[in-house]
Regions:
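Conserved nucleotide-state-sensing and coupling region of NTP-binding domains
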Residues: 83-130
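Conserved SF1/SF2 helicase motif Ia
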Residues: 74-85
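Conserved small/polar residues in nucleotide/adenosyl-binding loops
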Residues: 131-136
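N-terminal accessory segments
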Residues: 1-48
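N-terminal cationic-hydrophobic initiation segments that often serve targeting/anchoring roles
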Residues: 43, 72-73
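Walker A (P-loop) phosphate-binding loop of P-loop NTPases
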Residues: 57
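Hydrophobic anchor at the beta1->P-loop junction of P-loop NTPases
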Residues: 52
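Motif I (Walker A/P-loop) of helicase-class P-loop NTPases
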Residues: 61-68
Length: 136
């Protein structure tokens, strides 16, 4: 992938995160921006593997949830597996992603009517992509 395309994708993900934080009345901390850049780099660069190490309560799960919602918007056919040591932690992450999808302005068309396909551990979205966010 060209450097120009990688930069455009990073910008798109950062914009999505900034919009989410603005909706919550917050600004995006610099370390969240670095985490998002890392996640985009892992997603776009083979071998698509990385290890994210950050201090407790640094917002790793917050950024990963925003990243997952953005991936679903860009590629609605994607399947994302969330693993954790305890099922309550993975269910909480799914709930975080669901909250973003339900409330981010760019995600309105992704919510299925009746939400029949949603549960504590699974989200199925409408196969549409964000109207204002596209891959370069």
């Amino acid at each position: 992938m060209s450097h120009q395309i990688e930069n455009a994708m990073t910008t798109a993900f950062l914009d999505f995160m900034d919009e989410w934080n603005a909706l919550l009345g917050m600004t995006t901390p610099e370390h969240h921006r670095r985490i998002m850049k890392f996640l985009v780099d892992v997603w776009t660069s083979p071998p698509n593997r990385g290890l994210l190490m950050a201090f407790r309560h640094s917002g790793k799960s917050t950024v990963v949830g925003i990243f997952a919602a953005c991936v679903l918007g860009l590629r609605p056919e994607s399947r994302i597996l969330i693993l954790s040591a305890e099922s309550t932690l993975s269910s909480r992450m799914v709930g975080h992603i669901r909250n973003i999808l339900e409330n981010h302005p760019r995600c309105a068309d992704m919510i299925p009517t009746g939400r029949r396909t949603w549960s504590n551990d699974r989200i199925t979205i409408n196969p549409v992509s964000y109207t204002h966010l596209t891959l370069p």
